[in-house]
Amino acid sequence: MKELTSSQIRQMYLDFFKSKGHTIEPSASLVPKDDPSLLWINSGVATMKKYFSGQVVPENPRLTSSQKSIRTNDIENVGKTARHHTLFEMLGNFSVGDYFKKEAIAWAWELLTSPDWFGWDPDKLYMTVYPKDTDAKDAWEAVGVAPDHIIAVEDNFWDIGEGPSGPDSEIFYDRGEAFNNLAADDPENYPGGENERYLEVWNIVFSQFNHEPDGTYKPLPRKNIDTGMGLERVVSIFQNAKTNFETDLFMPLIEKTAALSAGKHYGANAEDDISFKVIADHARAITFAIGDGALPGNEGRGYVIRRLIRRAIVNGQKLGIEGAFLDQLVPVVGQIMQAYYPEVLEQSDYIAKVVRSEEDRFGETLTDGLNLLNSLIADLKQQGGNQIAGADAFKLYDTYGFPVELTEEYADDQGITVDEAGFKAEMQKQKDRARNARGKQKAMGLQHDLLINVKTPSEYVGYTQLATTSKLTVLVAGDELVDHVTSGTAEAMFDVTPFYAEMGGQVADKGDILDEAGHVVAHVADVQHAPNGQNLHTLTVVAPMETGATYQLKVDTIFHSKVEKNHTATHLLDKALREVFGEHTQQAGSLVEGDYLRFDFTHFGQVDPADLAKAEALVNQKIFEELPVTTVETDIESAKKMGAIALFSEKYGKVVRVVSAGDFVTEFCGGNHVKNTNEIGLFKITSESGVGAGVRRIEAVTSAAAYAYLHDHDEILNAVGADLKVTQVDEIEQKVQALQAQVKALEQQQATLEGKLASQEAGAVFDHVTTAGNYQLISGTVQVSKMDQLRALADTWRDQALSDVLVLGAEVNGKANLIVAVSADKQKQVKAGDLIKAISPKINGGGGGRPNLAQAGGKNPAGLPDAMTAAADWLAEQK
């Protein structure tokens, strides 16, 4: 067996298929682009859907890739098995209507067994085939596979619902008897069974049927090949590792974690090993996901990241790691993967910052979960129950990241159990929902043959002219290719067009189609790219049109000019934000409309208004400097040497377009722009807000729209000035400050009066000392307007040393509040935190605190008297 690193194995696979005429597709972002059916890119073929569905025609029908992927449907198994991962790499080769079974099988065999490539022992390889797929069986035998190494398996048919489907062939590597975990006569002890000896390394799907909506299967007009080889599994074979984790993809992370732990070592303890594996796996997924623009949040991709971070932190605690540590693993991931993913190491400072921020928040999450758990326990006791329902335990786990083990421990302290069977049932329901969703989604789509074979060229000339004469070459109406239309909606292609097709955040051009006599025959409502890249115009037809005829195409120049100004301003804003906030700020999305622009960017925390003003001022400064705006088309490497900024989430062709505004900004862009920044006139930010964890959104206007916005605000200021009875706008701020000072003084007077009233009322309570067992107790309810006043009363009680224990309650804004204080000489016997936990269920709430002072909040103010009684009863039971 050759000794190869993971980087060498990945490159060898890609080089092999490159030698077979394949184009190497770069690994796409984990965040799917234009595919709402996927939360994450979860396989190599997921990035090829646009080719297999006919939405886009690839330049080369032979493709290969090493695609980073994320799956979280079996997250509970990560760390417990040899090969479950959240993040993994899928090596694959693909044929879009080109070669088929014979070539795919022959090349697979060559890669695996040739001494020039993997060089594996042929006797260690086994293949499974679909029983009816005699072509695949014959192809394997033709390359020299022994018949007893080819196994027919009924499940070898790839089908995920409507769309391409077909038989598949799986390849297994025999790791030897030393890896066998089953008895010789076990029915699963065979290649394809559930065992550790025969390791599946490759699956080749022969996509030859279309699964129709009516459940039938029809032969595809173009047969495809889709394969997937898990890099981590292959590396474990080359490096003779018992599991995927003992390879160079994971061990540096495990070793770093061990160094951060309380003297723990991988391999010394099975339970600790699970934690080491979980942390290593999750650190990889977290790093790559954040690097691709996803951020921790409460839903969707953000929730997945948050859940992985929480799970890793809990496992770090099991290893004795105190405080934040995951951020220290981010650069380790970058170093491991830098050969193929250099951007991860380049972004490691930013990624680590995001991770550290989320780690620091984890304590808040635990607190929220604890409050919910206290409420559940209080409700149970009130109803006479003694078991937390499985659904509630699952909610704590799934929504708050509350480990079920912690729920069980905490509930046990209160004499409550957890319905483990119910919890596991809810877990299974979640898995079933995920599995059903995968089965039902139309992941590959039906092949669209209407435009896929239309290769009539259509030249875009809109960079230099906004009107042209052109021939109508393709016409679609009613989902059919037609040669003429008279009215209604239609799609059209022209041999030349000045209309921009929506792309890169810029909306499509609008305008009219005129006949040779100058009469309008159609309005252009939208423009999108067809499968072969042509501009496809959506028309509202008002007069007859026919293919082959010549028409005048005229772009709405007023709308187009507004879009140009907003698009160039977007690039100026992007650069200005990086100047003000730092290079960690990245574009997270944009929309360039005619009447406004929208720009999303990564930034943690609130945006300081002063910094936002700096960015706005910088954009306007560059507008007033009258910078020339130039564009150039060049190859991607030359563009990068020019310093052009590219988005990691975008894919670029061999030739790219670069836009520059003086020396201030140079970025990849295929959109329309002004010739000089002075054409923008004015730039004004109209709003800034958060749209997700770590993502901020700016909306802005330019030119006449910016003037109109400022004019409207002037009118508002004038109206406010009139209400405040000031004659000059610049006097408004001074007047408002004076009013605020007056309000603050009144509030202070009110607080002083309320404090005096509370003290008077508390005086009556403080005068009434009772005996509860061995302790002197003062308890009762008072009227206050906020919790701070309760704490102030506790301070008064402590200063006067009025009793051993104080318990006060109050209703504030419809909620119940409790405070418990214990004198210094009694804190060894009685702790305020213990007492508050005992009585807070009476108000349907929970709380905690220090031995000398604790507080709680709840939803049931009517329970405050019961809480006072419970406090006395609890104290009476203490020694």
UniProtKB/Swiss-Prot annotation:
In terms of Pfam families, this protein maps to: DHHA1, tRNA-synt_2c, tRNA_SAD
Q: What is its EC number?
A: 6.1.1.7
Location (main, coarse): cytoplasm
The processes (GO biological process) annotated in the record are: alanyl-tRNA aminoacylation
User: Which locations, inside or outside the cell, does it occupy?
Assistant: Cytoplasm
Give the highest taxon in the source lineage.
Answer: Bacteria
Q: Look up the record and report any one GO term of the cellular component aspect.
A: cytosol
The GO terms describing molecular function are: alanine-tRNA ligase activity; aminoacyl-tRNA deacylase activity; ATP binding; catalytic activity, acting on a protein; transferase activity; tRNA binding; zinc ion binding
What the entry lists under InterPro entries is as follows: aa-tRNA-synth_II/BPL/LPL, Ala-tRNA-lgiase_IIc, Ala-tRNA-ligase_IIc_anticod-bd, Ala-tRNA-synth_IIc_core, Ala-tRNA-synth_IIc_N, Ala-tRNA_ligase, Ala_tRNA_ligase_euk/bac, DHHA1_dom
Q: Which residues cross the membrane?
A: none
Q: Which class of enzymes does this protein belong to? A: ligase
Provide the residue positions that the database annotates as binding Zn(2+): 567, 571, 669, 673
Reaction equation(s) it catalyzes: tRNA(Ala) + L-alanine + ATP = L-alanyl-tRNA(Ala) + AMP + diphosphate
Provide the cofactor note recorded for this chain's UniProt entry.
Answer: Binds 1 zinc ion per subunit.
Which UniProt key words apply to this protein? Aminoacyl-tRNA synthetase, ATP-binding, Cytoplasm, Ligase, Metal-binding, Nucleotide-binding, Protein biosynthesis, RNA-binding, tRNA-binding, Zinc
Which cofactors does this gene product need? Zn(2+)
Q: What is known of its domains?
A: Consists of three domains; the N-terminal catalytic domain, the editing domain and the C-terminal C-Ala domain. The editing domain removes incorrectly charged amino acids, while the C-Ala domain, along with tRNA(Ala), serves as a bridge to cooperatively bring together the editing and aminoacylation centers thus stimulating deacylation of misacylated tRNAs.
* Main function: Catalyzes the attachment of alanine to tRNA(Ala) in a two-step reaction: alanine is first activated by ATP to form Ala-AMP and then transferred to the acceptor end of tRNA(Ala). Also edits incorrectly charged Ser-tRNA(Ala) and Gly-tRNA(Ala) via its editing domain.
PANTHER family noted in UniProt: ALANINE--TRNA LIGASE, CYTOPLASMIC, ALANYL-TRNA SYNTHETASE
* Protein family membership: Belongs to the class-II aminoacyl-tRNA synthetase family.
Protein name, entry field: Alanine--tRNA ligase
Organism from which the protein derives: Levilactobacillus brevis (strain ATCC 367 / BCRC 12310 / CIP 105137 / JCM 1170 / LMG 11437 / NCIMB 947 / NCTC 947) (Lactobacillus brevis)
Gene symbol of the encoding locus? alaS
